[in-house]
From Swiss-Prot:
Iron keyword on record: no
Cellular component GO terms held in the UniProt record: cytosol
Active site per the UniProt annotation: E309, H340, K459
Localization per record: Cytoplasm
Function: Catalyzes the reversible isomerization of glucose-6-phosphate to fructose-6-phosphate.
Metabolic or biological pathway, per its Swiss-Prot or TrEMBL entry: Carbohydrate biosynthesis; gluconeogenesis; Carbohydrate degradation; glycolysis; D-glyceraldehyde 3-phosphate and glycerone phosphate from D-glucose: step 2/4
Name assigned to this protein: Glucose-6-phosphate isomerase
Leader peptide range in chain numbering: none
Length: 489
């Protein structure tokens, strides 16, 4: 049961229902106005009700949209080209050699995943060797690793924050400012070593970032949907402009497929409906993401945010409590490494799960000798063979009446997402397919998939605790929290 979409195929053979059976059951859960909803989404007219703003990330797929949202196309392109060619100079006249993207959540996971997956598509190896780094952790742990290997005079920092007020991000930025002080003035740093990417232009201006160093995107682009926007700058810096545009083209092709393909051929809709059936009818509360290509090793973390932040909710878009299961727990890891870690539990443990396997059938290896290319091709076949074998064993199981340790119960439903090759287009199509899957499940469950009040509530409580740690408050919480605070003092 392989269904073909743009740059991507989906095999649902190991699900519990055929596609026709699925449409007769879970398909009836699609709301009456589903066609209108997906049209609205792709036109930028769907509403994020709780935050009273449109949902516009799909509009970012246009090759020219990122540049338009960043005020002028030439400025986005020029910034990328100058940095990648070594023509962008720091305040002391030395070329910029390192870029550090400081962000968290959607300002980190998507850009970092895209840069890692597509870095081999940079077709200008002779140009300046620009290194792109990512910093997100609020504890400063990543700064410990990055700051010793970069030079203040040759490093540019991208401050990526939709609100331009994210506490995690600015904790890192404040430490960087302290690190910079012995080498550069604050004016030098802001004018020549900082780029801001945000939906809040005024916030960037108030911080002191010159307008020429600001890249904006629309307020209707949610953080977890933002790698297509100006927040994808670090991807473009890694790959160059053309591979970044190709990624947008692949996503746009999946948008059109989502709008136009019949339901029984529609990859995002089928992913959504199988997920709904497995959650509601089979009672399975988790989905493992298992990519079998090392370039996609960051996919599980990205999809964890995309899905769980969107649909991990107990209330409808109208803020009414619900009493049925919604989005599953998303987890997983790089498949070949998982085989030597958690696959034992998947094969012979008691817990039920569903899985999305992701495989790439072929991989080009330009720049290597014939012998090396042959070896790499053999390794790709090895990865595909293992993907197919473990998926089959998880589904069909294996019995040995004489040895309980050789019994594999099977019965675990799974999808297989297939790319003939991992290209910028197929990568863009893959991510867009999952976005539309999450959207479809959200409308089935009556959710607003574009807010995240749980995240905001946690931030507020954290600030209350921080004030106590800083001696600005004597508020008491609970026995455990108070004991840790006292121990830290």
């Amino acid at each position: 049961m392989i269904k073909n979409g743009p740059y991507l195929a989906l095999d649902t053979s190991y699900q519990k229902l055929s596609v026709d059976e699925l449409l007769e059951t879970a398909g009836k859960r699609l709301p009456e106005h589903f066609d209108d909803y997906r049209q609205q989404l792709c036109r930028g007219e769907y509403r994020n009700i709780s935050e009273d703003r449109p949902v516009t990330h799909v509009l970012s797929r246009s090759v020219h949209a990122v540049a338009k949202q960043s005020n002028r196309k030439t400025r986005f392109v020029d910034t990328v080209q100058k940095l990648r060619s070594g023509r962008r100079l720091g305040s002391t006249g030395k070329p910029i050699t390192d870029v550090v993207n400081i962000g968290v959540g959607g300002s980190d996971l998507g850009p970092q995943m895209g840069a890692f997956a597509l870095r081999e598509f940079a077709n200008d190896a002779a140009l300046h060797n620009l290194q792109v780094h990512f910093v997100s952790s609020m504890d400063g742990g990543q700064l410990y690793a990055v700051l010793p290997i970069v030079d203040p005079e040759t490093t540019l920092f991208i401050i990526s924050s939709k609100s331009f007020g994210t506490v995690d991000t600015f904790a890192n930025v404040d430490t960087v400012r302290k690190w910079i002080e012995p080498e550069l003035t604050q004016e030098q740093w802001l004018e020549n070593h900082v780029i801001g990417v945000s939906a809040n232009a005024q916030g960037m201006t108030d911080y002191g970032i010159p307008p020429a160093q600001q890249f904006t995107f629309g307020d209707g682009v949610g953080g977890r949907f933002s790698l297509w926007s100006a927040l994808g700058l670090s991807i473009a810096l890694t790959t160059g402009i053309r591979p970044f545009e190709r990624m947008l083209e692949g996503a746009k092709a999946m948008d059109e497929h989502f709008l136009d393909a019949p339901l029984n051929e529609n990859l995002p809709v089928l992913l959504a409906l199988y997920g709904v059936y497995n959650r509601e009818q089979l009672g399975i509360n988790n989905l493992a993401i298992l990519p079998y290509d090392g370039r996609l090793r960051m996919l599980p973390n990205y999809l964890q945010q995309l899905d769980m932040e969107s649909n991990g909710k107990q209330y409808t878009a109208e803020n009414e409590a619900i009493d049925y299961p919604t989005g599953p727990i998303i987890w997983g890891g790089f498949g070949p490494n998982g085989q030597h870690a958690f696959f034992q539990h998947l094969h012979q443990g008691y817990d039920q799960f569903t899985a999305d396997f992701v495989t790439v059938l072929k991989r080009e290896a330009p720049g290597f000798s014939d012998a090396t290319r042959s070896g790499l091709a053999e390794q790709q076949r090895l990865a595909v063979a293992n993907c197919l074998a473990h998926r089959r064993l998880m589904s069909d199981g294996s019995e040995n009446a004489d040895s309980p340790s050789d019994h594999y119960p099977g019965g675990h439903p799974s999808n297989l997402l297939i790319m003939d090759e991992l290209t910028p287009e197929s990568f863009g199509a893959l991510i867009a397919a999952y976005e539309h899957k999450v959207f479809t499940q959200g409308v089935i469950w009556g959710l607003n998939s574009f807010d995240q009040p749980g995240v905001e509530k946690g931030k507020k409580i954290a600030m209350d605790v921080l004030r106590v740690l800083d001696g600005e408050s004597d508020e008491s919480f609970d026995e455990s929290t108070d004991a840790v605070i006292q121990r830290m003092r």
